[in-house]
Design a protein with these regions (language model features):
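Flavin-dependent oxidoreductase catalytic core characteristic
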Residues: 1-650
């Protein structure tokens, strides 16, 4: 069996520098590594080895204790989203209160007046009030503007009357709602004097803070078991003429006079602020779950030996090109996702800093970019978990590998906070607007979309002889060809008599999706490339450049149609791309373990028997089956005898 330590000793990269890129700075990487090391010593934050044999109720209660232990470890700095990194990496499942701390608190800080912040923020942070983010309804999710819950202003009492007028209007799916929350940030249609002023947000108490019983007019509970998120109390909520004070509508950008005059200011997209902050979290913290999958799968691939070579020695499965093909492009994509996520995070912070000053100029670009990255990144994490599971054979199928839980716990992210197809369509809409802007006002195109300033130059690019220096130009060419063809297709449908909305909905969906997704792949490449420029260690820069090129070549090979259709490349170029792909697999294989271990993950957070740091998969797996699996400690003799008696007699 290949020793993991031998593989590590052969590595030539500087893991400290790489960890600094991953976590934003070497100091932050050191803090996360120390946090994860501290977790190894605290029993309360460990996930029990027999966790997946437990009932949902027992799992829920254990995670409640774990969540509070994590909060103690971060000194209750729950309003600092960076502090979530350690707990989310270490925990096997989603954490209690995570949704409301990541969404309700930011919403209050961005959408609330100072008086409202003073009234609620401290209680929320200290969890004296536990609030859920009650937006999604039984009948509507991504289509926020069609929500049916109503908040009708009563001028006589200076109150809002909250109602769910239909069964479809019932809030359904909000996390922390089913059991834990006693307050809800409710999104409802604002009705004043019979006029609908659109969806606004309201702080509504739903349970008594002492008895935890539902208040009058409230029907609330848990929606039941799910594919993943078993310890998350996703809930349902109905209102029957529930009255709340006028003060409870978050009112920094909208207000109502006592007489019922409605006044709005700022960008309408500001109402999506908390969703944007949650998408930032999905961009920066959750992708590190893919590092867990790859750490397990790569360690196992170095230690697992199958079939002999020509010298009669068993090969580590990582030596096989098919195994490299499964895992190394995922490793390259992981770095592209994480490093571009860091860049996006800074843009989000800049946007909301400017919003607080009354400057909304970055809002559209920020919202659109977050839509696309959220869709691309969350799909990647789930896809990565599945391929890592497959790469570990039968062991990958078992919970003791640590891989099934990653797939289950991150699958919901593909749908929550904006279903991924809808998210790509929102980005595509913005890209088409940029196409028009490029013709009239190219100076107004944001930096993150600057390739739209060079459309003619990009459209004229041809590549007869592939070199790695051409990867960026080829990605740019794919993006611009796809979006311009989509724009022309839309014009043709409109000129043929179809209205724009019908063309969008029924004729352009796949083209729009492909354009948006490809733009994000290009964006990831650019961010990855720019981040490598910060590396000072020469060999590390070489290895990361190889990893970057593998990412780029993989994208080009997976999606070459736009380049071939527009004669940007030839069949010979495609062959050169395939040859370079195989060459890059060979170059990256010796460094793959050290690259993924730059994420500083601790064994307890991996929750695996097959991918631990000391490389003893068989010892840990057998020990778990013999000593930890509670099913083996139950006497089933009576059950077996009863089954014998039930067998048909021939």
């Amino acid at each position: 069996m290949t020793s993991l330590e031998q593989v590590r000793q052969l590595s030539k990269i500087d893991q400290i520098q790489i960890a600094g890129l991953i976590f934003g700075s070497e100091q932050r990487a050191k803090e996360v590594k120390q946090f994860l090391a501290d977790c190894e010593k605290i029993p309360e934050v460990q996930t029990n080895a027999d966790f997946y044999n437990w009932s949902r109720k027992k799992q829920f209660l254990s995670k409640d204790k774990q969540g509070f232990s994590f909060m103690k470890m971060i000194n209750n700095q729950v309003d600092d989203m960076e502090q979530y990194t350690g707990p989310m990496i270490y925990s096997a499942t989603t954490n209690h209160y995570g949704v409301y701390l990541a969404m309700v608190v930011p919403a209050l800080k961005i959408l609330g007046t100072q008086e409202q912040i003073n009234a609620w923020l401290d209680d929320l942070i200290q969890i004296r009030k536990a609030a859920c983010y009650a937006q999604t309804e039984l009948g509507h999710g991504s289509d926020i503007q069609s929500l049916q819950t109503t908040a009708t202003y009563d001028k006589g009492t200076q109150e809002f009357v909250i109602n769910t007028p239909t069964i479809q209007a019932a809030k359904f799916w909000p996390g922390d709602l089913g059991i834990l929350a006693n307050w809800a940030l409710v999104f409802a249609q604002l009705i004043v004097d019979g006029t609908n002023y659109g969806v606004q947000s309201f702080m509504v108490q739903i349970r008594d803070e002492q008895t935890h019983k539902p208040l009058k007019g409230i029907e609330v509970g848990d929606i039941g078991p799910k594919m993943g998120y078993q310890v998350k109390d996703n809930g349902f909520l109905k209102f029957d003429n529930v009255r709340i004070p006028k003060f409870n509508m978050l009112a920094k950008y909208i207000s109502i006079s006592p007489q019922g005059k409605v006044m709005k200011e700022g960008d309408p997209k500001i109402s999506y602020a908390s969703m944007m902050m949650m998408r930032k979290l999905l961009n920066t913290v959750y992708p590190k779950a893919a590092a867990i999958s790859l750490t397990i799968a790569l360690r196992y691939s170095y230690t697992r030996q199958q079939f002999t070579n020509d010298k009669g020695v068993e090969n580590s499965v990582i030596e096989y090109q098919t195994q490299q093909h499964k895992l190394l492009p995922l490793l390259a994509n992981l770095f592209a996702v994480v490093l571009s996520g860091n860049v996006t995070s800074k843009f989000v912070d800049l946007n909301f800093t400017e919003v607080q000053k009354g400057n909304f100029s970055h809002m559209n670009a920020c919202h659109s970019l977050l839509c696309g990255t959220k869709a691309n990144y969350t799909h990647f994490v789930v896809n990565c978990a599945e391929w890592c599971r497959l790469s570990c054979g039968g062991h990958g199928y078992a919970h003791y590998s640590g891989l099934p839980s990653i797939y289950q716990e991150h699958s919901p992210n593909v749908t929550l906070e904006g279903e991924n197809q809808i998210m790509f369509l929102q980005l595509a809409r913005y890209l088409l607007k940029l196409l028009k802007t490029s013709q009239k006002n190219p100076e107004k195109i944001p930096e993150q979309f600057s390739l739209f300033k060079r459309i003619n130059e990009i459209l004229s690019f041809k590549c007869d002889q592939f070199q790695t220096s051409n990867i960026l130009s080829l990605l740019e060419s794919s993006v611009i060809h796809l979006i311009t063809q989509t724009g022309m297709k839309m014009m043709q449908e409109i000129q043929g008599g179809m209205n724009p909305k019908a063309a969008w909905d029924y004729k352009l969906g796949t083209s729009l999706w492909e354009s948006a997704n490809y733009f994000i792949e290009y964006y990831k490449f650019v961010c990855f490339q720019n981040t490598i420029l910060l590396v000072t260690h020469k060999q590390t820069q070489v290895v990361l450049t190889n990893l970057l090129n593998l990412f780029g070549v993989t994208i080009l090979l997976q999606n070459p149609l736009a380049l071939l259709e527009n004669d940007v490349i030839t069949q010979q170029t495609m062959k050169q791309l395939r040859d370079e792909y195989e060459n890059l697999l060979n170059l990256i294989k010796p460094e793959a373990l050290s690259l993924v271990e730059s994420f500083c993950l601790a064994d307890g957070g991996l929750r695996t028997t097959i991918g631990r740091a000391d490389g003893k998969p068989y010892e840990y797996t057998y020990d778990w089956a013999v000593n930890e699996n509670s099913l083996n400690k139950i006497d089933f003799s009576n059950t077996v005898n009863q089954l014998k008696n039930c067998r048909p007699k021939l």
